[in-house]
Every structure is written in C-alpha cells, then in structure tokens.
Amino acid sequence: MATKTNHIAVVAENRKARHDYDIEETIEAGIVLSGSEIKSVRAGRVNLRGSFARVIDDEVFLYDAHIAPYEQSGKYFNHDPLRPRKLLLHRREINRLNGLVRMKGMTLVPLKIYLKGRRAKVELGIARGKKIYDKREDIARRDAERDIERALKRRIRE
C-alpha cells in the first residue's frame, strides 16, 4: 500500500491582508473547484488581492479570488475567473465564524491558497481592519527591530 503524503505547497499568498488587517485567528477550509480551476491552481495562476469571504445562509463563499482560465482547455470549457466559490467547513465552524463576523469590525480574509496532498485548501483569517496610524506604528516597529539587528550584528563582528 502506498504511503500517504500530506505535502503542503503554497500556491498564492495574500500579503496585503497582513498589512491591512490585524489577524485575530486563522482557520483552514476546503474549496469547491471545477476541473479547469484546480488545474489553474496547480499551475499557480491564482490572485487573492482584494478577495474576501462571507457567510450566506449557513454557507461560506469566497468572493473576488481570481483563478485564471486554464490555458490548455478551449474557450468553451473554461470557468469564470471571478465566480464565487464555496468553502467547505464543519457546521460548528460556520456558526462560530458567523458569530465572530457579526461583531463590529470583523471580517473573513483569505490569507493563502495551498495544496495539501491532492486537495486545494484556503487559510482564512478572522481579521479586524487596521487604521492608518496602526499601519505606521507597525512600519516604525519593524524599522526599529531592523536597526537593533544591524547594531547587534556590528557588535558581534567587532
């Protein structure tokens, strides 16, 4: 019997989300894709910038995630690149997410799409939007940490 490997390969990452939002918690969800969509995902032709997820009628959907049409299939057998895609979660997870998102200022943001074994997964972040001054504080903190690292490196060399 063949051994099972759960090799994880990140296909697309939403770096802007970590800059624009304060991520409270992350959750893994499956995603329902058609044949040409999964082929495009495996080829890495996914863009998550500006995408978001919503809970509608006890189901979670991913909106504005661009999965490019598959090159090798004809123009008639391809998918709509921006169609809403259903995310697969357990009922209790959906209810919990629905409760968290109803809180003021909370939203569901896809952080990355990756392949886990043969299946495509989405990492969702339960996030709160950052204010402009929060973003500036983060940048200043990163710059200060970088300066400290440089100073320590210089001191070690001497």
UniProtKB/Swiss-Prot annotation:
GO cellular component entries: cytosol
Any one GO molecular-function label of the UniProt entry: RNA binding
GO biological process: trans-translation
Spans through the membrane: none
Gene3D superfamilies: 2.40.280.10
RNA-binding listed as a keyword: yes
Keyword Ribosomal protein among record annotations: no
Subcellular location: Cytoplasm
Pfam families tied to this protein: SmpB
Top-level division of the source organism's lineage: Bacteria
InterPro entries: SmpB (IPR023620), SsrA-bd_prot (IPR000037), SsrA-bd_prot_CS (IPR020081)
UniProtKB keywords: Cytoplasm, RNA-binding
Family that this chain belongs to: Belongs to the SmpB family.
HAMAP family, A to Z: SmpB
Function according to Swiss-Prot or TrEMBL: Required for rescue of stalled ribosomes mediated by trans-translation. Binds to transfer-messenger RNA (tmRNA), required for stable association of tmRNA with ribosomes. tmRNA and SmpB together mimic tRNA shape, replacing the anticodon stem-loop with SmpB. tmRNA is encoded by the ssrA gene; the 2 termini fold to resemble tRNA(Ala) and it encodes a 'tag peptide', a short internal open reading frame. During trans-translation Ala-aminoacylated tmRNA acts like a tRNA, entering the A-site of stalled ribosomes, displacing the stalled mRNA.
Protein name, per record: SsrA-binding protein
